[in-house]
Each structure stands twice: as structure tokens, then as C-alpha cells.
């Protein structure tokens, strides 16, 4: 199968877009975007058939490739972890630009691939970063990403939310499950454990917020990624808990995507 034919057939698959195809050609077949234009009749090896089959089965291109680029790092991904979204990268980059995490203790809760905590650890080598997830398989992926990116100031804990967390932190950052049970998702490949959180999608936030006084320092701060449209319900959860003040921030698409918590004065 030629490069040109692979591209044509891949783009005929619903949900597959040109950036996905170009990434696959580059990362798996070492074919650049220039090669696609000037050398489109070049033959690809037999993996091309297998990859088209996987795309037809709605497997995300990131899982086919096995890694993504995130905040300047290579992050390994597989079906044990969510594929980091650009909103998460936006959160990380904004935090790293506005907060000096040097010599601070940070928890990446529900860490998945580790993209959030490892990005902070990489940029602030004097920080102490703990990454936690209920899934040992996810922790294994995060540990591999620590090795790939040559990070020395990150450790890992298997924990059901905050149940096994004993330390107190200056900052807690979390992209927890927030999809209501029974919601149809774009792909069946991503782990349900990292997606779904009760009938309203907010159970994970309730569990975390109720235990924050035990793991957050007096002047500590919390940053959540949230689903647009749930901000009022989340602020109500924070208000009922009574200790913290919640502030909603919008992303670059002007959607309510982040919630920031700190103690009331």
C-alpha cells in the first residue's frame, strides 16, 4: 500500500482526521509531511493494513502510536490511561507560568499517565511531586513516563482518591473522572475507571472535596479540571462543605473548564 493510498483510506474512516494520519505516518513509518506530498507513491510496509483495521475499530491514533507530545514531553499512553486532552495541557502550562512550585509539595490526584504531575516536576526540579491513582496499571504507565523524561523528584502511590494519602500538600491538582454513568463516550478503548463518576458525574469531586482538610495545608490551593456546564453544581458542593471558596476559570474556547479552591478568609 502506498503512502497516498493509506492516507486516502484512513481519511475515509469516520472520526479520523488529517493530523491523526500525519502523526501515524511520521511516528510509525518515519514518513514526514513533505514525503506525503513528494513521495506519495512510496510503498508502506505490511503494518499499514493492521493500522487501518485498528482505525476502523475506532482505536484512537494515540494508542496506535503509543505516545503523545504533552507540554514539551513525550508521554506514553495505552488503554490503561486516558489520552491527555489539550484542555489539560492548557491547565498545566497556565499553572507553570503563574505559580512558582519550587520547594513545594504537590499532589497529582487521579494521575493517569502522569502528564500533569510530571510536567510540574520536570519544570520545577526542587519540588516534591506525588502522583496517585486507584489503578496500578495507570501508575505503571506514569512510572514509565517518569523514566522516559528523566525526572527524579516524583513518587507514586496507589490510592482510591485520598484514602491512602497521608501527607499534607501545598498544591493539589486533579483531573478526576467526571462523566455521568451510562453516558456514551467517543471511544470504548479508554478506561471506564478514569471516565465515569456516579449518576451526575460529580461523585469524585464530592469524595475529594470532603477530605481536603486532611491533606491540604492551611494556605494550600487546589486546581480541578471540570466539565463545562457542571460549574454551578460543583460550586454548590464546595459551598456545602463550607471550608473553601471555589472560583471557576474558562479555557481558551471560553468554556468553564477549571475550578480553583482555597480556604475562606
What does each model-identified segment do?
Residues 41-46, 97-105, 126, 163-166, ...:
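Short, glycine- and charge-enriched coil/turn segments that flank and shape catalytic ligand pockets
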Residues 15-18, 42-45, 82-86, 198-202, ...:
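Short, solvent-exposed loop/helix junctions and linker helices
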Residues 50-124, 129-144, 254, 260:
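SAM-dependent Rossmann-like transferase core, predominantly class I methyltransferases
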Residues 1-65:
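N-terminal auxiliary segments of SAM/dcSAM-dependent transferases
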Residues 37-41, 67-73, 190:
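Short linear capping/connector segments at secondary-structure termini
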Residues 126-128, 134-264:
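S-adenosylmethionine
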